[in-house]
Structure formats: C-alpha cells, structure tokens
Regions:
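PRPP-associated nucleotide enzymes
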Residues: 1-195
Length: 195
C-alpha cells in the first residue's frame, strides 16, 4: 500500500499492474456469459473506458467481440461531490441498439447501487431482455435491490472513506485509491475557489 501526500488522507491500494490483473479476472468471469446478443455498456465516465478494456481482453484471451456502448448517468462530480440526489440519466447518450439484447453494465465502483439500479431499470424499459452488472471494485453500503454479477475486487472499508478509480483518459494512470471524505471535500472546495 502506497501512501500519497503526508496527511494519511489518501492511500493507493492497487497500482496499474494490479488493475490489469483485476481486468483479466473480470474478462475470465464474463467470457462464459457472452453470446452474440451481448453488449458491454459502460456508464460514463469511467465505466466506458473500462468496458473498452474489458472488450479488448475478451477478444484477445477468449476470441469474443461484444459490441461496446455507453450510457451517461450523473450523480457525482469528478471530485466525487454529490451533484444530484438521484442519478440523472441522459438516455440520448446511449449509442447502441438494446432491443432484445443481453447487456453487461460496467462501472468503476459499486457502493449504494443507485446509479446502476437506475441504469438497469432504464435499459430494461428500453427493451433489453437480460441485464448483468460488472464493477472494477465494490464496497459495503448497497441500498438498492441490485447485486454485482462480476467484481474485480471487494473492499471492506469504513463509511468515511471513498474509493477513487483512476482510469485513463480521465486520469494519466490506472490505479485504485482510498481517500478520506474530508480530503475529498477539501479538494472539491479548493476546485470551487479556483473557478
């Protein structure tokens, strides 16, 4: 575990190599469930590049080539500040056909499940026949009737800590960091003052 900064408010728990291992494991777990009707749908922002990385591994290691799409939902800002009480869905951002399809929804972190639950309900109402979920990591705190079908890593962390997945192109490296919520708030407030 690498400590960033000097105030113990942020800890890197998985580096780039570790994230690649988690993605390989996810691909191995997902592969038996992929059919010709399967599409990977990444939740923007970080879920989309994760879906693309997962699709690359499915092709390279398993000879599978599922279509990759994206869906935009917004609940938190990039600094993890709460923007909307309920996740906001931009259904026009969905860029693939979903009627009668098996969808695997992909996002970086499963916490309360509100974002993924709302996405799954929207896609089911839009015609998807079977929906599964995949996450790079998960933590306790689920509030919705949802489960993770595929998870790279599970972390049992205290409620006042936040999991942040660094995923290019939004960050310059791959990694998973734990940050204390006070540090997240401080960074968010500093960003507001800079505007």
């Amino acid at each position: 575990m690498t400590q960033n900064g000097t105030d113990n408010s942020e800890l890197q728990i998985i580096d780039s190599d570790g994230v690649h291992v988690l993605l390989d494991r996810l691909a191995d777990a997902v592969a038996p469930h992929v059919s010709p009707s399967t599409a990977l749908v990444g939740i923007l922002r970080r879920g989309k590049p994760l879906a693309e990385m997962l699709a690359e591994r499915l092709e390279t290691h398993h000879g599978l080539l599922p279509e990759v799409g994206q869906l935009e939902l917004k609940r938190y800002s990039d600094s993890l500040e709460l923007l909307h009480e309920r996740p906001y869905i931009d259904e026009d951002a969905l860029d693939i056909e979903i009627q009668d399809r098996h969808l695997i929804l992909i996002d970086d972190v499963l916490y309360t499940g509100e974002t993924m639950f709302r996405a799954a309900c929207s896609l089911r109402a839009g015609g998807a026949t079977f929906i599964q979920t995949a996450f790079l990591c998960a933590r306790p705190g689920l509030k919705m009737p949802l489960h993770a079908d595929f998870v790279g890593a599970r972390f049992d962390i205290l409620q006042d800590w936040v999991i942040h997945c660094a995923i290019p192109p939004y960050e310059d490296h791959l990694g998973i960091v734990l940050a204390h919520q006070d540090a997240v708030r401080k960074t968010s407030n500093e960003n507001e003052e800079d505007r």
